[in-house]
């Protein structure tokens, strides 16, 4: 009787340490998918409290509610056309902008880029950046 009980405890403890935070690329994909569904609540869950936003100035998303509002204000969704890992926790994402539910995208078909820094499975920096020329052939770059 003692052996099965001890075995259960060992199995339970070994399962506790096995999880790891999602990769930066996985977090970016999840954020993009949530935004494309207009699921601002889910998109916001991927941001750490205190996340920095660099887009026409700088802002800090101090709370989850701030992150929900910021995501809800984005006019476009985007199809990821390229992800480039820039170190363990940073990803450059290139998007083709598209409409998203209940929004009016101001640049459908254009490309946009953002650098994401991710720590412990949460976005700590979202920085809009110019689209590298090699990813914008014939397209309008914003």
Language model feature labels by segment:
Residues 12-15:
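C-terminal motif of bacterial Sec signal peptides marking the signal peptidase cleavage site
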Residues 38-50, 54:
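Short, well-ordered alpha-helical segments enriched in acidic and aromatic residues
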Residues 122-142:
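Low-complexity, intrinsically disordered terminal/linker segments enriched in charged
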Residues 1-8:
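Sec-dependent signal peptide recognition
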Residues 25, 40-44, 64, 68:
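An amphipathic alpha-helix signature
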Residues 65-109, 115:
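Surface-exposed, charged secondary-structure patches
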Residues 21-38, 46:
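Short, aromatic-enriched amphipathic alpha-helices that serve as compact interaction elements
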Residues 17-19:
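Bacterial signal peptide processing site
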């Amino acid at each position: 009787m003692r052996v099965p009980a001890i075995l259960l405890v060992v199995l339970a403890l070994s399962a506790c340490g096995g999880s790891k935070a999602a990769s930066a690329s996985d977090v970016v994909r999840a954020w993009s998918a949530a935004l494309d569904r207009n699921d601002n609540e889910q998109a916001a869950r991927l941001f750490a409290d205190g996340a920095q936003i660099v887009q026409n100035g700088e802002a800090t998303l101090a709370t989850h509610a701030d992150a929900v509002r910021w995501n809800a204000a984005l006019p476009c969704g985007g199809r990821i056309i390229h992800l480039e890992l820039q170190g363990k926790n940073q990803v450059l994402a290139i998007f083709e902008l598209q409409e998203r539910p209940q929004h009016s995208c101001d640049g459908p078909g254009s490309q946009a880029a953002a650098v994401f820094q991710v720590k412990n499975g949460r976005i700590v920096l979202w920085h809009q950046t110019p689209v590298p020329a090699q990813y914008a052939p014939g397209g309008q770059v914003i």
